[in-house]
């Protein structure tokens, strides 16, 4: 059969590209080894050093478990900080104070020396749902589906792909050679290479199927209040609550407004209220201690006064009750003064709650409708007598997010200020990570100074595989922390938006650092761009030859092993948190302050960062599951241990988070990138080893191209929705009548006010019973109105989109 002119042209072009890259008919493996003769990364050690690395990592894991067991029982309840956290800091503690506290004692006392270890297996999803929230259930369900997927992938990789690779005879017959287990062991004319591409397609469909089953199992419960509340930006800063209510009554007479809350800058007031609360707890602690002992306690409140062993001038001791009483009075004065200033700091935003969801939906559609007039398209909502005064044409209207999802202190940062801050942070982050993307650059720098030369002759797997993979894991844990904290500094309006952007940034960064650049033999983004665009570089001709080096897969197998044992062990120990916790306990000036530190040490679980970390390792596993099938069972071990550690941490360590469903669906989309990268890896292998004209290369290329086209069509144009794994269920309230009755009932507290300020409002109401009947969500004559630091926490993208419009 005569080849078509198109294929001949394509082949000639492919040959020229391969020649430009310095690739011959067959890669020169010895050259790759010789080019790194002074390096500690690529060495032909026994079976890639995997047995030695596995033994060391398992030993380290057992040691970390032992250390954590000791610390958990001896050091300030470090292993159960969520259980001893402040009882009224989160709604779950209020809800479970009478039912779950005894259950916690059962876990601590009934199970022997390591109750936390067996508690991981005894915990039921109902307990986790009640204690940790539905987001934790969705997260753990996602992990379970990944576990079942990897069980199937491991079975197919070990029972089908591995024997096929071992049947080749291209590499050494040594049974201790790791390269015999990889795809590099097959001859270029072996028809079994087709099997790898077919199984890669099967893995793609398996991933879509498992993810679709996961999203179908999600029953997302929408809060009644959130579904009836709209968030409005673009209000004049001098707008009044009564004017906004009148506008909706006149423009939408069929829609009944239940409440309107204007937004104010209450960041400082929130801080003062938290400090006052800590002071009151310390005062109560020493008051109760005096009642119990009959003696007044002396403290040294000066900086580092707890280290003073004797009383000298400037380091005098004073009565604890008198000190905290004085601090409480001072904070109350500052709070009262700040309350007066709050009314002068409106944010131009408001929450509007309606009687029914249909009313809120109708108004939202009216504001977002696009009415085209000639060549100009603009939306004009229904007018009222206050439309001109309120500039309704400039409003941006969206559904409100859950009040627990709002980052209250960030609401005052909006518009141009928010964008400038975002650009500055991310530009600085990019510059910093441009040259320090991977730990490989550290190894290269060490090699330049001949640091590794004395141990080069040892050819020890501990040196050549354990330390590089441990270093890779260490940097993959450290450097994303920089991305994590940079996201916190961006001042997002919602925790959901913060977590989703954090997940995307950390995931992309980790994939480059852990998978793409090490696979290409590159050391940082600097070298990546030089290799990509600098055609005259002498380094460009040697990079791609080392992509599918026989022992290259061993490096990633060892990385997965390190993540499974050392990574999960360190995540259980949480060494940075332990260091911070220890430092805060040492620096606490009094016993009451140490009690406050213990009760305020727990933080919300960062689903964004945890999703990104787990999906990075999952992507590495899937990307090499065909070319290096040995990685699959170790990946399964990683996910199993990760699931156990996360169950423990969610229940005992972290506070619950209330996020939007978008964070969980974004994780599903990122999981689909793993089998697609596996197809890319097979295509690169076929292109480099077989050539573009090879049937297996053409078939793999067509599959990759078709997959990309389907993804683009679904993402950009909404096609192939039946193929999408995103198919979740929304639970409706049991009774609409109950919802209507609930809408007319006065809530126990103002929903769109920070919890700490809401408690202050309750105190004022208790002190002034005559005002209780007059209290409304947006009133500015009481604390809930003076501090309505309410600002809708939009969805991840919505909050960012609305922010610049407030400039």
UniProtKB/Swiss-Prot annotation:
Mechanosensitive cation channel with low conductance and high activation threshold. In contrast to TMEM63B, does not show phospholipid scramblase activity. Acts as a regulator of lysosomal morphology by mediating lysosomal mechanosensitivity. Important for the baby's first breath and respiration throughout life. Upon lung inflation conducts cation currents in alveolar type 1 and 2 cells triggering lamellar body exocytosis and surfactant secretion into airspace. Also acts as an osmosensitive cation channel preferentially activated by hypotonic stress. Residues 555-586 are annotated as: Gating helix. It is found in: Lysosome membrane; Early endosome membrane; Cell membrane. It comes from the Eukaryota. InterPro entries: Csc1-like, CSC1/OSCA1-like_7TM, CSC1/OSCA1-like_cyt, Csc1/OSCA1-like_N, Nucleotide-bd_a/b_plait_sf, RBD_domain_sf. This is Mechanosensitive cation channel TMEM63A. GO terms for biological process: lysosome organization; surfactant secretion. Residues 75-134, 218-416, 491-495, 587-606, 652-661, 710-807 are cytoplasmic. It catalyses: Ca(2+)(in) = Ca(2+)(out). Belongs to the CSC1 (TC 1.A.17) family. N-Glycosylated. The modification Phosphoserine is found at residue 739. Residues 1-51, 168-191, 445-462, 533-554, 625-628, 690-694 are extracellular. Pfam families: PHM7_cyt (PF14703), RSN1_7TM (PF02714), RSN1_TM (PF13967). It comes from Pongo abelii (Sumatran orangutan). Monomer. The chain crosses the membrane at residues 52-74, 135-167, 192-217, 417-444, 463-490, 496-532, 555-586, 607-624, 629-651, 662-689, 695-709. Residues 219-414 are annotated as: Intracellular linker IL2. Glycans are attached at residues 38, 450. GO terms for molecular function: calcium-activated cation channel activity; mechanosensitive monoatomic ion channel activity; nucleic acid binding; osmolarity-sensing monoatomic cation channel activity. The gene is TMEM63A. Keywords: Calcium, Cell membrane, Endosome, Glycoprotein, Ion channel, Ion transport, Lysosome, Membrane, Phosphoprotein, Transmembrane, Transmembrane helix, Transport. It is a multi-pass membrane protein. GO terms for cellular component: early endosome membrane; lysosomal membrane; plasma membrane. Its main location: membrane.
């Amino acid at each position: 059969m005569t080849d078509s002119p198109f294929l001949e042209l394509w082949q000639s072009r492919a040959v020229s590209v391969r020649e430009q890259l310095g690739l011959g008919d067959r890669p020169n493996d010895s050259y790759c080894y010789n080019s790194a003769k002074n390096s500690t990364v690529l060495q032909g050690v026994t079976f890639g050093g995997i047995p030695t690395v596995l033994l060391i990592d398992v030993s380290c894991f057992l040691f970390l478990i032992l250390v954590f067991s000791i610390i958990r029982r001896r050091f300030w309840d470090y292993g159960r900080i969520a259980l001893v956290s402040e009882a009224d800091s989160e709604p779950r503690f209020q809800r479970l104070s009478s039912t779950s506290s005894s259950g916690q004692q059962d876990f601590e006392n009934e199970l022997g020396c390591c109750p936390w270890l067996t508690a991981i297996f005894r915990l039921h999803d109902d307990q986790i749902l009640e204690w940790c929230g539905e987001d934790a259930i969705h997260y753990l369900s996602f992990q379970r589906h990944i576990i079942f997927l990897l069980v199937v992938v491991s079975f197919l990789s070990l029972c089908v792909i591995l024997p096929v690779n071992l049947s080749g005879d291209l590499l050494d017959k040594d049974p201790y050679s790791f390269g015999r287990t990889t795809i590099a062991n097959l001859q270029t004319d072996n028809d079994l290479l087709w099997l790898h591409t077919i199984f890669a397609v099967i893995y793609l469909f398996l991933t879509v199927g498992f993810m679709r089953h996961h999203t179908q199992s999600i029953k997302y419960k929408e809060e009644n209040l959130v579904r009836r509340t709209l968030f409005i930006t673009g209000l004049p800063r001098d707008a009044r609550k009564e004017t906004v209510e009148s506008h909706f009554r006149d423009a939408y007479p069929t829609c009944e407004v239940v409440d309107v809350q204007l937004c104010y800058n209450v960041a400082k007031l929130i801080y003062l209220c938290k400090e006052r609360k800590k002071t009151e707890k310390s005062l109560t602690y020493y008051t109760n201690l005096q009642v119990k002992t009959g003696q007044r306690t002396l403290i040294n409140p000066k900086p580092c006064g707890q280290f003073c062993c004797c009383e000298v001038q400037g380091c005098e001791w004073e009565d604890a009750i008198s000190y905290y009483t004085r601090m409480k009075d001072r904070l109350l004065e500052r709070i009262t003064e700040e309350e007066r200033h709050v009314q002068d700091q409106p944010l131009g935003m408001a929450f509007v709650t309606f009687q029914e969801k249909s009313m809120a939906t109708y108004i939202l559609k009216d504001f977002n409708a696009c009415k085209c007039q000639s060549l100009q398209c603009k939306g004009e909502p229904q007018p009222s007598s206050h439309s001109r005064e309120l500039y309704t044409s400039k409003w941006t209207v969206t559904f409100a997010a859950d009040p627990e999802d709002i980052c209250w202190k960030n609401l005052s940062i909006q518009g141009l200020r928010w964008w400038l801050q975002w650009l500055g942070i991310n530009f600085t982050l990019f510059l910093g990570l441009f040259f320090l993307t991977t730990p490989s650059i550290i190894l290269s720098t060490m090699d330049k100074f001949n640091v590794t030369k004395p141990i080069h002759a040892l050819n020890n797997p501990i040196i050549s595989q354990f330390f590089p993979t441990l270093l890779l894991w260490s940097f993959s844990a450290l450097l994303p922390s920089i991305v994590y904290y940079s996201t916190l500094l961006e001042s997002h309006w919602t925790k959901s938006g913060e977590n989703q952007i954090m997940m995307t940034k950390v995931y992309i960064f980790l994939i480059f650092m852990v998978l793409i650049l090490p696979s290409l033999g590159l050391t940082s983004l600097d070298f990546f761009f030089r290799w990509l665009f600098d055609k005259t570089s002498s380094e460009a001709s040697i990079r791609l030859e080392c992509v599918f080096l026989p022992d290259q897969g061993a490096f990633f197998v060892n990385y997965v092993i390190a993540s499974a044992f050392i990574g999960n062990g360190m995540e259980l120990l949480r060494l940075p948190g332990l260091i911070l916790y220890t430092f805060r306990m040492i620096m606490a000036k009094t016993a009451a302050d140490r009690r406050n530190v213990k009760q305020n040490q727990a933080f919300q679980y960062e689903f964004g960062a945890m999703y990104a970390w787990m999906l990075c390792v999952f992507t590495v596993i899937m990307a090499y599951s065909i070319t290096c099938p040995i990685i699959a069972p170790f990946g399964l071990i990683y996910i199993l241990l990760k699931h156990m550690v996360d169950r423990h941490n969610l229940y005992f360590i972290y506070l619950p988070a209330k996020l939007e469903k978008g964070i969980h669906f974004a994780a599903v989309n990122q999981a689909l990138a793993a089998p697609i990268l596996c197809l890319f890896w097979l295509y690169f292998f076929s292109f480099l080893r077989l050539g573009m004209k090879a049937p297996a290369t053409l078939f793999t290329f067509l599959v990759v191209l078709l997959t990309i086209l389907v993804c683009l069509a679904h993402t950009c144009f909404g096609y192939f929705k039946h193929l999408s794994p995103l198919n979740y269920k929304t639970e409706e309230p049991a009774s609409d009548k109950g919802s209507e009755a609930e809408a007319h009932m006065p809530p126990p507290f103002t929903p769109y006010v920070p919890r700490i300020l809401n408690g202050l409002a309750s105190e004022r109401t208790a002190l002034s019973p005559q005002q209780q009947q007059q209290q409304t969500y947006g009133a500015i004559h009481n604390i809930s109105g003076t501090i309505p630091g309410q600002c809708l926490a939009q969805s991840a993208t919505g909050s960012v989109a609305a922010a610049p419009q407030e400039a």
